[in-house]
Curated annotation (Swiss-Prot):
SUPFAM superfamilies: C-terminal effector domain of the bipartite response regulators, CheY-like
All residue ranges annotated as the HTH luxR-type domain in the record: 144-209
Post-translational modification as stated in the protein's UniProt record: Phosphorylated and activated by RcsD.
NCBIfam families, per the entry: PRK10840.1
Gene that produces this protein: rcsB
HAMAP family, A to Z: RcsB
Protein name per UniProt: Transcriptional regulatory protein RcsB
Self-association and partners: Interacts with RcsD and RcsA. Homodimer. Can form an heterodimer with the coactivator RcsA, which binds to the RcsAB boxes to promote transcription of RcsA-dependent genes. Can also form a heterodimer with GadE to bind to the GAD box, and with BglJ to bind to the bgl promoter.
Organism: Escherichia coli (strain K12)
Amino acid sequence: MNNMNVIIADDHPIVLFGIRKSLEQIEWVNVVGEFEDSTALINNLPKLDAHVLITDLSMPGDKYGDGITLIKYIKRHFPSLSIIVLTMNNNPAILSAVLDLDIEGIVLKQGAPTDLPKALAALQKGKKFTPESVSRLLEKISAGGYGDKRLSPKESEVLRLFAEGFLVTEIAKKLNRSIKTISSQKKSAMMKLGVENDIALLNYLSSVTLSPADKD
């Protein structure tokens, strides 16, 4: 089996440590870089001979942002780099939008400890990886009767930040878009989800996440 050079990006040092220790148990995986923000990650990517990036979905960074914005930038400027997203966000609408970016895998931080090694093993075979926990979440989209959940990546990014507590004005600044654009994308997403106000939106975002009984 060919060796796989991996970069890890997460803004929590203890998470970086845990991932590295987990990957050290896989003899064909080499960790060649660890970064705590997207700016440091992007600045160092050209210097590293990496095959795979394991990155958090929500991570600080000034110029390059995080989430879908960061993933799209990396895929555009580093097309040969495979991407596995590691996230605490288990909202199916957002996970669906992330998968639409044609990444190689997505792993929930609260999922099974074996999911990340399985994702890398699948990647070695030229396959993508979606754990059962994520597949079950995506099934809730059709089973829950919440309307058309096919959010665009931009709509998904706005909802992710809104769910994290950011105001529309703050989201506009963070994503370098106008307040009018952010408001329009938020309204469009709400129409797709069939919710009429912010309270209903927050209730939806919390109601279609992973319940304890659903976990691996």
